[in-house]
Amino acid sequence: TPEGARDYLVPSRVHPGCFYALPQSPQLYKQLLMCSGFDRYIQIAKCYRDEDLRADRQPEFTQVDMELSFVDVDDILDVNERLIKKVFKEILDVDVQIPLQRMKYAEAMTRFGSDKPDVRFGMELHDITEIVKDTEFVVFKNAIEAGGSVRAINAEGCGHYPRKQIDSLVEFVKTYKAKGLAWIVVNDDGSLKSQIAKFFTPEKLQEIVSALDGKPGDLILICADKDKVVFDSLGALRCEIAKRQNLTKPGDFRFLW
């Protein structure tokens, strides 16, 4: 069946003008075995996909491919968890505690803005739509009236960022279709600085900061748009800030279903 990636096409030496494709995901053996009555099939297979190289993509990769008959979700998760535990112990000498943490899709999107959240650090999303619903600030007002939301993250300890660095974060979220970011800096003396201060009373700004447990030295970043745009933008932004602030360690593994 057609898949998202392109096949690697190899010219046939024996049949001029004909080609064969390297496997994107081996199917034939699996289908034959399952049709023959085998109750389960697990294969470690080399796969090839003609796609651009990215952090989570490469042309050649090794895939654990499995088909199990008469099982439910918990059976599948159990097989994979025991496999992960064994591999990480034997290869990296890392003890993985099972069962692994599970999180529903809606919770992952609401808290982290991603269906594959990095839970090694906080900086969770907070919905502040109710707090700002009566605002006359056009960006927030239009987003709410269109059925969207206003959400924010607290980049703890980033209040020292110069304006140029904050602007780079604004440009970053624009690649995820966000129109921009509003921001509030909590100064060391507890006072607040923001480019949207003229649209809100000091009490309302403080209410926003308090909702995110903001403290002196923190940077509150706010995005208003359709939910998908807000989730995509803030979900990617929290990971970008974590990378800049070195909030994650290479050997720290946090598995999540």
Residue map of PLM features:
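Class II aminoacyl-tRNA synthetase catalytic cores and aaRS-like
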Residues: 1-257
